[in-house]
């Protein structure tokens, strides 16, 4: 039963909502299409706000699981009133009005859960005067949905959403002369189906949107109504709804993303099943589907305007135009199979894109605004992936809406998004990574993940760390040059992954061009843009990492330099102390010589030794001097002569050489001036005193870096 048939049937208004709830229209699934026969009891309740009393109304068609709610019926009547306000538009136009508005969320039902499409319109739509309202902000008269602000002033959909989300009036600069509603391919055969689907999908959208929970009838305002182009499919709602508030400011440029492709896919048959089809923006569908989708409410002339407005999303109206299937034209002929296919597609989507579906929210945030064309419209990617999952059900071509500038964006169902997948991995991966090869992934949100993982894994921050360890080794070796070399190596290692990423991106672009052939470049371009953004972000992180590592290396150098300076200062102090000790020892020896000189004949033999030591006061004593014997007693005298005991020599390296020297008593010093001819060596009493004198030389190993503790 088509929408026109249902709408043409006059219905008896009754004021009892109980009767409405009691008499739920039965859902009859025929082979050709799911037609709903409404019982006479299922009549609209009279709504005080409706200016029109006798309105042909689409009866609520509850699925077996979902009971009919009087509130829904009121909304249905209100929306039907709205649709009937202009000179009675064809039923297609009524659905046009109904579809762009976000649905209310009743509990989710199976593929063909049905509630009238009128539920999608908010209660405010019924308040519009019949004379044709004018937006109080932008003065426009063309809008898919009229809204009111807190003061009751009539606003267009865009201004109302902008005010609601941003708390301030929508700037006039954002005003566009084209309507922002989404295209719908609605033919008489599919009108009833679409009406069912809008109601059926409302539960999914609304149940998944936490933000629109407080406004059951008006959830569309904030959630899906905000861009009219926020054609978030039921699967998209989980992740994409967070985008909605952010995208609302960009409502003029439809953020419709993923749902576009799905809409194209399922537009003919899936309208009943998937709410996202109704909310799909017309960007991709615009050229071919505009006449189909906008029989009356939005003239096809606005489609080019929509293209211009949403050009970032429009990636390929040209290729998509050829690729956009003739299925919309074949809706009447292919009712049975499309419906069944829609059921299967919905099933697949619900499985893959259910509440458990995990999308990267960070990416979604990036994809929020189409105003910034550079941002990655992740939602479009998600939509394309989800539509791919349901591609088995229908042969329609997906046009993924991505902000990329390429003109071709439609992907055939059968093609898994191989092209976008290779690009994403390449961001993090080096040239050797298989990212250039196409990956088949059922959902693109997973595709968005790989770059992050590879950024963590492939982009090796480790090589710089290893280089830092080499810096430490070089520093410990004391070689500043080694540190600089390691710095150079480090910078090279850091540069190489970035260059590798750039090469990979280029290679991926080439591969994508080769792989696309008949496929959408739109997905590839969107992925490329995402890759570029992630690559730039990744480069920034690499630069920050390099800076931190360089700072660490500088700190290591500084600490090493400080250590070396401290060591040098300590060595100087030791040298000074050794010199002082040497001077003290020399003074002691001089004093000792004086004592010997003062002694009588008994000291005549020993006097030459001290007498000669003043001459040697400036000399450093080495252990080899023990073997030096004088032919002339008045000249070279070994410092150890006539010293009994052991000389302990301590080097600054804390080595101690204990040289036990037995000074022979026959070592006699003959003096020419002294007449004592004996060969006897006389040990003087001072020699028997125990003294520890340190004879130290500051000149190192052989020259007397050794501290000599002499027991005299």
From Swiss-Prot:
SUPFAM superfamilies: Glucocorticoid receptor-like (DNA-binding domain). The keyword Zinc applies. Its main location: nucleus. A zinc finger (GATA-type) spans 135-159. Disruption phenotype: Leads to altered sensitivity to fluconazole, LiCl, and copper. PROSITE patterns: GATA_ZN_FINGER_1, GATA_ZN_FINGER_2. Transmembrane segments: none annotated. Induction: Induced via CAP1 during oxitive stress, as well as during biofilm formation. It comes from the Eukaryota. The keyword Ribonucleoprotein does not apply. It is found in: Nucleus. Keywords: Coiled coil, Metal-binding, Nucleus, Stress response, Zinc, Zinc-finger. One of its GO terms (biological process) is positive regulation of transcription by RNA polymerase II. GO terms for cellular component: nucleus. Pfam families: Asd-4 (PF25026), GATA (PF00320). PANTHER family: BOX A-BINDING FACTOR-RELATED (PTHR10071:SF281), TRANSCRIPTION FACTOR GATA FAMILY MEMBER (PTHR10071). This is Transcriptional regulator GZF3. It comes from Candida albicans (strain SC5314 / ATCC MYA-2876) (Yeast). The gene is GZF3.
């Amino acid at each position: 039963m088509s929408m026109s048939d249902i709408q043409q049937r006059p219905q008896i208004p009754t004021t009892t909502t109980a009767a409405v709830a009691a008499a739920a229209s039965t859902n009859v699934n025929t082979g050709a299409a799911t037609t709903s026969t409404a019982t006479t009891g299922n009549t609209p309740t009279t709504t005080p706000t409706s200016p029109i009393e006798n309105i042909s109304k689409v009866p609520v068609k509850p699925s077996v699981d979902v009971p009919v709610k009087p509130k829904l019926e009121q909304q249905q009547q209100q929306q039907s009133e709205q649709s009937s306000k202009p000179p009675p538009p064809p039923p297609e136009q009524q659905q046009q009005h109904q579809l762009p508005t976000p649905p209310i969320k009743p509990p989710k039902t199976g593929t063909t859960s049905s509630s009238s499409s009128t539920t999608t319109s908010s209660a405010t739509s019924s308040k519009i005067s019949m004379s044709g309202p004018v937006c109080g902000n932008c003065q426009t008269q063309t809008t898919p949905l009229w809204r009111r602000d807190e003061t009751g002033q009539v606003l267009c959909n865009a201004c109302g959403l902008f005010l609601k989300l941003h708390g301030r009036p929508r700037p006039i600069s954002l005003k566009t002369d084209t309507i922002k509603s989404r295209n719908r391919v609605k033919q008489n055969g599919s009108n009833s189906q679409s009406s069912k689907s809008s109601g059926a999908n409302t539960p999914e959208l609304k149940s998944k949107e936490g933000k629109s929970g407080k406004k059951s009838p008006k959830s569309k305002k904030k959630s899906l109504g905000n861009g009219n182009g926020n054609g978030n499919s039921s699967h998209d709602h989980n992740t994409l709804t967070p985008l909605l508030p952010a995208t609302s400011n960009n409502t003029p440029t439809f953020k419709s993303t993923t749902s576009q492709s799905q809409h194209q896919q399922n537009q003919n048959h899936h309208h009943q099943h998937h709410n996202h089809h109704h909310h799909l923006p017309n960007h991709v569908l615009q050229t071919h589907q505009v006449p189909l989708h906008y029989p009356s409410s939005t003239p096809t002339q606005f489609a080019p305007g929509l293209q211009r407005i949403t050009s970032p999303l429009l990636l390929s109206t040209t290729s998509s135009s050829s690729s956009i299937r003739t299925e919309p034209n074949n809706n009447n002929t292919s009712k049975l199979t499309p419906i069944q296919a829609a059921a299967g597609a919905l099933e697949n989507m619900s499985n893959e894109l259910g509440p458990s579906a995990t999308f990267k929210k960070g990416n979604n945030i990036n994809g929020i605004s189409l105003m910034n064309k550079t941002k990655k419209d992740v939602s479009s990617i998600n939509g394309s992936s989800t539509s791919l999952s349901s591609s088995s059900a229908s042969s329609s071509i997906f046009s993924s809406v991505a902000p990329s500038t390429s003109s071709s964006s439609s992907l055939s169902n059968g093609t898994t998004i191989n092209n976008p997948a290779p690009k994403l991995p390449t961001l993090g991966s080096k040239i050797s990574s298989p990212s250039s090869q196409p990956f088949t992934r059922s959902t693109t949100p997973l595709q968005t993940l790989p770059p992050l993982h590879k950024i963590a894994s492939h982009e090796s921050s480790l090589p710089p760390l290893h280089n830092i360890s080499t810096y430490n080794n070089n520093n410990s070796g004391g070689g500043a040059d080694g540190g600089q070399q390691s710095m150079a190596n480090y910078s090279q290692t850091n540069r190489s992954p970035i260059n590798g990423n750039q090469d990979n991106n280029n290679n991926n672009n080439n591969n994508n061009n080769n792989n696309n052939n008949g496929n959408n470049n739109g997905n590839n371009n969107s992925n490329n843009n995402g890759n570029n953004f992630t690559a730039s972000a990744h480069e920034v992180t690499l630069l920050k990492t390099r800076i931190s590592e360089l700072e660490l290396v500088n700190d290591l150098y500084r600490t090493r330099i400080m250590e070396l300076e401290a060591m040098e200062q300590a060595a100087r102090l030791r040298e000074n102390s050794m010199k002082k000790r040497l001077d003290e020892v020399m003074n002691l020896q001089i004093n000792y010589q004086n004592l010997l000189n003062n002694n009588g004949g008994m000291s005549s033999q020993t006097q030459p030794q001290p007498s000669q030591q003043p001459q040697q006061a400036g000399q450093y004593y080495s252990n080899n001097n023990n073997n030096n014997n004088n032919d002339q007693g008045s000249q070279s005298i070994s410092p150890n002569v006539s010293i009994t005991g052991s000389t302990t020599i301590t080097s600054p390296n804390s080595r101690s050489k204990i040289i036990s020297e037995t000074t022979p008593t026959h070592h006699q010093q003959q003096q020419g001036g002294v007449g004592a001819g004996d060969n006897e060596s006389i040990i003087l009493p001072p020699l028997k005193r125990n003294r520890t004198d340190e004879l130290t030389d500051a000149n190192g190993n052989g020259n007397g870096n050794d501290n000599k503790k002499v027991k005299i």
